[in-house]
Structure formats: C-alpha cells, structure tokens
C-alpha cells in the first residue's frame, strides 16, 4: 500500500508540473521558458501539449522553477488590483482556474492530517475557491447565504453589523447541514474586516460542531485578526497579505 501511495504522489507531482507549465505559457514564450528552465523548446512543447510527462526527478526540478514564475503567490501578485477609489477588485482572481487549482492543492497540503468533514463559505465570491477545496479534500460544501431558501424548514443564522457602513447582514445555513460531529474548515477568497468569518465561526459553534480552521487567499491588513476568535491550536492560513489602500 505504501508503494502505491508513493507512485500516486509522484504521478500527481508530474501532472501538476504540466499544469504549471501550461499556466506559464500564458505569460512566457517557449524560448523564454527554455532560457529559464534549461530545457529545449521542443521538450517543453511536448510537455505543455500533454504528449509526454516529465519523469519524477525532472518534474521536481521544473516545479521549483515554475513555482517562482507562476506559482500561487506569483499569480496572486499579478492579479491583485485596487480601483481608483481604493476598493479591492477580485474579479480576475475568483474566476482564474489556475489560481483556484493551485489554492486547492495548497489547502490540501496545509490541512493534511487535520480532521475536516465540511467546507463552509459565505455567498458569493468564496464559492469557486470553496468548491475546489472541498473537491480536493473529498468533503461536502455548505454555503451560508444572505436569504432564506424556500423549502428549507429550519436555519442556523447569524446577524452582524458591517463596521464600515452600519448595514446589518444576516447569514443563513440550513440547520441540518452542520452536525455536532462535524469539523468545519472556513474557506473564503478574501478576509477584509473579519466580520464574515466571525459570523461563520458563530454558526459552527451554534451547531455544536468543531472549527477546523480558516483558509483564505488574501487578507487585507491585520485589523481583522481582532474579530476572529478561534479555539486554541486552530490555524488561520492566508496565502497573501496586502496593505489596505
């Protein structure tokens, strides 16, 4: 069994390296990639087109090089944008399949060994990432929505006030979606004030489930940390932090 697991991991690395190479091809020519990797253009082309897979040793070498060029942090750095009013524009992040795929793999590696039975996110921008993470971890996804759905008999709900606007917000989760024995990982594309994540934590605790951790691609500043209270030893993983404009 151990031998099969090793082969599976090696194959996964080789396939993920090809995916990174295909992502790199969006920003660099084959000639540029050849210069950076030391591999002939023809070899890189065959890899990128899926005609052949690199062996494990070459995949490891390529992975290290490509990760610096188009790895998760590098890609986020390219896509993070603020508009003229200083508001964060996540349009080019939540729909980027390369970023979502890498983020899901990163979440899998980060929370490996921890018990996670449910992924919880708030509608709407966190849904693509949460879906990918749930698929990667092999667990179900629960979405906290801003409106009650017809046909759902009972809800867990949490109301909070958005600090910057004074607007009241309520999140609703079907009552039977979270069970007492669940260990719930909160996933979102961005943490700004921490209020949404704090509300999700309260919903989990109201269901008497366990908080497994919080995972986010981006965090704006550090003020949000004051609003998020997690059980001792419960991790918060943020891929990239940016300063508020």
Which stretches of residues belong to each language-model region?
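PRPP-dependent phosphoribosyltransferase catalytic core
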Residues: 2-13, 201-245
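Alpha-helical residues within the helix-turn-helix
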Residues: 35
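Active-site-facing substrate-recognition patch
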Residues: 5-27, 31-32, 48-115
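Short glycine-rich phosphate-binding loop at a beta-alpha junction
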Residues: 116-123
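Active-site/ligand-binding-proximal alpha/beta "capping" segment
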Residues: 179-182, 186-206, 210-212
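Short, glycine/charge-rich flexible loops or terminal/linker lids adjacent to PRPP-binding catalytic cores
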Residues: 139-184
């Amino acid at each position: 069994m151990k031998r099969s697991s090793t082969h599976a991991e090696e194959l996964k690395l080789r396939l993920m390296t090809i995916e990174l190479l295909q992502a790199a091809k969006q920003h660099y020519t084959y000639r540029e990639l050849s210069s950076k990797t030391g591999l002939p253009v023809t070899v890189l082309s065959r890899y990128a087109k899926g005609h052949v897979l690199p062996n494990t040793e070459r995949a490891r070498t390529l992975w290290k090089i490509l990760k610096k060029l188009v790895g998760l942090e590098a890609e986020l750095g390219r896509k993070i944008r603020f508009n003229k009013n200083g508001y964060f524009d996540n349009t080019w992040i939540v729909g980027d399949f390369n970023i979502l795929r890498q983020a899901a793999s990163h979440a899998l590696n980060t929370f490996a060994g921890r018990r996670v039975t449910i992924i919880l996110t708030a509608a709407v921008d966190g849904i693509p990432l949460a879906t990918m993470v749930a698929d990667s971890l092999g667990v179900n996804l629960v979405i906290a929505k801003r409106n009650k759905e017809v046909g759902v008999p009972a809800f867990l709900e949490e109301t909070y006030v958005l600090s910057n606007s004074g607007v009241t917000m309520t999140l609703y989760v079907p009552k039977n979606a979270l069970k007492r024995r669940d260990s719930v990982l909160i996933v979102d594309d961005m943490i700004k004030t921490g209020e949404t994540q704090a509300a999700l934590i309260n919903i989990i605790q109201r269901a008497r489930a366990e908080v497994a951790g919080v995972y986010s691609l981006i965090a704006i500043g550090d003020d949000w940390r004051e609003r998020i209270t997690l059980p001792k030893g419960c991790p918060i993983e943020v891929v990239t932090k940016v300063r508020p404009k």
